[in-house]
From Swiss-Prot:
It holds the Pfam family KdpC. Residues 114-126 have a biased composition (Polar residues). It comes from the Bacteria. One of its GO terms (molecular function) is P-type potassium transmembrane transporter activity. The gene is kdpC. This is Potassium-transporting ATPase KdpC subunit. It is found in: Cell membrane. The chain crosses the membrane at residues 8-28. Residues 113-132 are annotated as: Disordered.
Amino acid sequence: MQTIRKSLGLVLIMFVLCGFIFPLTVTALGQVLFPEQANGSLVKQDGKVIGSKLIGQQWTEPKYFHGRISAVNYNMNANEVKESGGPASGGSNYGNSNPELKKRVQETIKQEGQKLSSDAVTTSGSGLDPDITVDNAKQQVKCIAKERNIDASKINHLIDENKQASPMADDYVNVLKLNITLDKL
C-alpha cells in the first residue's frame, strides 16, 4: 500500500511539474527574453497583423514579388485544413527523378517564357518558405517595374538593400519585407 501511495504521489508531482510549472516557466521566459519570436515574429502595419517574417504567404498581384511555389497552396487556416483534410504545411514529396516534378517544372518554365532560378520552380520542404533567392527576385523585377511604372534600377536597389547573406546557400530576401518596402516607394 505504501508503494502505491509513493507511486501516486510521484505521478501527481510529475504531472504538476511537467504539465504546469515547466510549460508556464518556458512560456514566461520566452515572453520576457524573446517577445517577438515567442509571438510568431508577426509583422504589423497600421496596427494590423499582415503576416509573419517566418511564414510565406501567397502573392497573386503582378505588382508584388512572388514567393516560392507552395505544395500546400499556403494553406495555414486551421478550419480549411479540417474541411479539406489537407496538410497545413509540407513539401510535395516529389523526388528529383519523379516525372510529375519534371512535368510541373517544365510547365512553369514554359509559362514564364524565360530561364528561372531553381527556387522559382520548386517547393520548399515546408511549403511555406518566406524567402526567395536574390536571383529569383531579380528575375521578377522587369514585370514589377512595368506594373508599377517604376524604374527597374530602383527595384534592384531595393533588393540589394534587403539582401541577407547565407553561408551555406545563395543570398536571399524575405518576400513580405520586400513587398512592404516596395509599397513605400
